Amino acid sequence: MNVENEYLELLKSWCDGLIRLQFQKEDNPRLDGGIFCPSCMMIHGRCHDAIYPMMYLADRLKEKKYLEAAKLLFQWSGNLLCDDGSYYNDAQNDWMGITVFSVIALTHALEFHASLLTAQEKEKWEARLNRTAEWVFQTITPQFDVNINYHAACAEAMALTGMYFHREKYLKRSDEMADFCMQYISKEGLFFGEGKPRDDVSPKGCRPVDIGYNVEESLASLLSYGTIRKNKIVRDKVKHMLWVHLEFMNPDGGWDNTMGTRNYKWSYWGSRTSDGCQLAYGLLGDEEPVFSDASYRNFKLYKRCTHDGLLYGGIDYYEHGELPCVHHTFCKAKALALLLDFGAVSVTPSELPSEHLDSVKYWPVIDTYRIARGGFIATV
């Protein structure tokens, strides 16, 4: 099986798993279209991000069930849409910053696969995108007091929607947000700002750094921005940061985020609610062969952790009866769909930095040592 078919097979498995958990024909608008989470025993508000991978498969495989699932998700998402154009994170959680991720997913769905929709459906989806993108523009500014990943995602969302709607103010905002994010690079090349306050420095001189969010979300968003806007300065800085962060990938494709400021979401292959390192490393695979191998090793870890069409939170979760949260699956499905849409799923076998580590390396910005001894790697 070639690599592209491997990616397609896993994406199909995931989307089939999500569809099995999707409420359909319940004759209840609060339920119909939502995806039930067997672990959290609820419908996660962000499950409608799966619109994009469903649309990809509908287009690629010509199977109606994926298009129907995408349309139901769009319909269900209206339950969490607010008057100001934002989305609630969950029915029980009024955090609205996650709207930026929905904007990115819906833009990809329309950008690549709008031909699957009727003219009336497309108009309705674009009207929704227009509302949510405007909320992002009005709300997520450099002054918005949140973790840095939201500013990075805003740069991508504004670049995407600015191009889609031919809206100059969005493009200018994307430039502003990317420039803002470039201020959050440590001397070692680690992206910081995953904490409050973002600019805080600990008594030991440490900054809030989260490897998981960086490689799976922030750096991918900034790379996307740099590519769309042809901003070579940002793109080159992101590539350098990806090299630096790659030192924290283990040989099996897992990430060491033990020291991360948001390590409560650490799930070995990445972070619970972000989209996956496939985006950043996979999209640069042609330029940096080791990146393609890193992306593929992480992908193979996804396969090891997938059972019955759902991505489990770690290698041993299934064996111990720990049910999977669907957030893992629908977030990572977006990344696989985008790689397939871009045709960026090649792999060149290479050697990861973790396979030839120095015996001891110290990272002052996170007050952390990486130690390699006799085939073992430790983080202290």
Label every model-predicted segment.
Residues M1-R46, Y56, R60, K64-Q75, ...:
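Low-complexity, Ser/Thr/Pro/Gly-enriched N-terminal "stalk/linker" regions
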Residues M1-V3, H48-K64, F101-Q120, A153-E168, ...:
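Well-ordered alpha-helical scaffold segments within catalytic/enzyme domains
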Residues Q75, N79, Y88, Q92-T139:
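Well-ordered mid-protein domain cores that form the structural environment of catalytic cofactors
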Residues K232-R235, E247-V380:
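Extended polysaccharide-engagement surfaces of secreted carbohydrate-active enzymes
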Residues A119-R198, I211, I228, R235-L242:
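Eukaryote-skewed repeat-based solenoidal scaffolds used as protein-protein interaction platforms
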Residues R20-H48, D83-V100, F137-A152, E188-E217, ...:
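Solvent-exposed loop and edge beta-strand segments that line ligand/cofactor-binding
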Residues Q22, L61, L81, H113, ...:
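Alpha-helical junction/boundary sensor with strong preference for TPR arrays
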